[in-house]
Amino acid sequence: MLKLCQTRFLLPNCFTLTAVGVVGVRRVWQSQSVIPLGAFLFGLVVGSFLNVCILRIPADKSIVLPASSCPKCGKAIAPYDNIPVLSWMILGGKCRNCKTKISIMYPSVELLTGLLFLACYFVFGLTVDALKWAIFSALLVVLTITDLRERILPDSVNFFGVGVGLLFSFFTKPTDGTALWIANRWFDFPPPQPVLSFVDAVLGALVGSGLLWVVAEGYFRLRGREGMGLGDVKMMAAVGVFLGLKRTLMTVLAGSLLGSVIGIVLISLSKKDRNYELPFGTFLGAGALLVLFFGTPALQWYQSLLAVK
């Protein structure tokens, strides 16, 4: 009887302590220091997975099995040797088993992805938009590095990007208002926001891929050889689904400028000739990231200049 009374007496206290603990954990999680750190660390882990995608997708291998191993000796990498960035630094950039040098690409991709996820949190907050742009950034990392290494832009990554971008369009705001502008001129009432967002995504994909297809076809007819693969066209469909029409055009412009500058520098330094195949997808990916984080302020600044004139 005494034990039962003690149990009944302690039970409310247990609930109180549990409630206090839950509130405390929530406050710590919502603090301004833990969430950015969590976003960065999660980005590092995702970056480790992106390395697997970069290496295996072009070779048409599974990104799930087998476990990661040293490309030289084939020894499976232990979990404690697979900690993003940190393991590479501890091992001195070498395989623990055969001492073969491990490419700096691995920690670079992990660190880049971590920083991009951190930037998505700071710019978009703890929102669905932040998740959308984090996934978009991860896709761009895979496409950019793969094109730089292999000169290909895998269809599986591009089509996955199109599908994910269209899916997110139903849960996020319209990207640039192009669909709303069209609706105001054709309808007496604006369509629902998910419809506007979906139309914005489709317009971005059509304009992005269509513009690059016209450029590629024109180059082929003028020069008699391909100057741009269809991978770039499909990549811009994925980029356009996420960014919408206006920022997709800005991406093409930014990517073209980056590619032109790098190409001129390489030729002027006599390191490459005029027929050198530049990885245009790499520059498009870099341009898309620049537009993602700086495109809206740049567009607002440009529109303000036009308004002044």
Task: Give short role names for the model-derived ranges.
Residues 53-105:
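Membrane-proximal soluble regions of multi-pass membrane proteins
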Residues 39, 135-260, 300-309:
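Functional transmembrane core segments of multi-pass inner-membrane proteins
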Residues 50, 54, 116, 120, ...:
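Alpha-helical membrane-inserting segments
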Residues 230-231, 265-290:
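Interfacial loop-to-transmembrane junctions
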Residues 29-37, 103, 107, 127-130, ...:
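Hydrophobic, aromatic-rich alpha-helical transmembrane segments
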Residues 25-55:
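Long, highly hydrophobic alpha-helical transmembrane signal-anchor segments
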